[in-house]
Amino acid sequence: MLILNFNNMKKVYIAFLSFAFALTSCEFDAGFEDMNVNPNAANNVAVANKFAKTVLDTSGGRYENWRNSLIYNSVLIQHYSTTASYWAGDKYFRYDSYATSLWDRNYPTAVKGIEDIINQLNQEGNSGSEMGIARILRVFIYHRLTDTHGDVPYSEAGKGYIDGILKPKYDAQQDIYMDMLKELEEAVAQIGSSSSMGNADAIFGGNTTKWKAFGNSMMLRLAMRMTKADAASAQAWAVKAISAGTMTSNDHLAAVTHTDGPEGINKNGHGEVFDVDSQMRLSATFESHLSGDPRLSVLFAPGSSNSVIVGMPNGSTSDSYVSATTGLTVPGVTDRHVYAQTHPALRGKDVPMVFQT
């Protein structure tokens, strides 16, 4: 009987404490949310600040510019040539970590950033110049991704936080191209006579006239890349772009301003590569295309063992080998310094990264 009374007393005591705590908890909680907020952190980041970061993410760092832009694409299209075996673009080798570098870097940074910017502009009711500029940059980001990989996440990409889409679908490249053209047309129309981006815009400094020319020129570029797939649509969009007004001088050149430090994307990604990898040389194919062109001596300088600009044949190796096609012995390159290099003025880490001319 005493045990039962003791248990009953425990229950009453616990109930009393719970009731007392409930009465006082409101007083204890008052202002708790304010105490748990970092007074030095911003509640909302301005679109201009996000845009500055996204532009630098799009320009990219050493990682993706070395692997995607140079090791693969530059020798694949035969602007550069090298005897280095890991420069796989013109040697039919495959390195997945190199081939996917643009994807690996852009989706978590540039794609996520630009989708967040557009979402914030929508929430703020901004349908003017800032939205038009953001949409043009968005097209440029996806333009490079689909040209590199074909079908890619597009319509649902970068919306993991915004819409909870954790597994975005892959869109067909044809659908992506048609939507990008539509986006450019609408984006240019949204841009007015001024923008609040200002110095946060490391491409044009908020100059809306130049952004319009960039948007129309990118429309023309996309149209030209469609000629083998859909000639009629390509012609229609090309005419539309030219009529709207494309780039007409070097003053319209779309390029990102970089600095020689601190580390990371503040530096030109290509410049960082040139600082540590001296393997690449002018391609003989590109040299032939620029024969008699004054731009050749602006882009390249003679190799240290030569006084004239000479290009290296693509597919060259440092050792001789027998061609499986002709049965002839192909001599190896014994002195790569005979061949031209990128002009020193273009190799710095503070050189602008050109998006389009």
What are the roles of these predicted feature ranges?
Residues 26-81, 85, 94, 105-108, ...:
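Membrane-proximal, proline-rich intrinsically disordered regions
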Residues 1-36:
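Bacterial Sec-dependent N-terminal signal peptides
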Residues 44-45, 80-137, 141-357:
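Structured, solvent-exposed acidic/aromatic patches
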Residues 20-21, 63, 231, 303:
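Alpha-helical transmembrane segments and their juxtamembrane interfaces
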Residues 11, 25, 76-77, 256:
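Intrinsically disordered, low-complexity regions enriched for glutamine and histidine
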Residues 14-15, 71, 142, 225:
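General helical structural elements
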Residues 9, 33-42, 297, 354:
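A generic signature of intrinsically disordered, low-complexity regions enriched in glycine/proline
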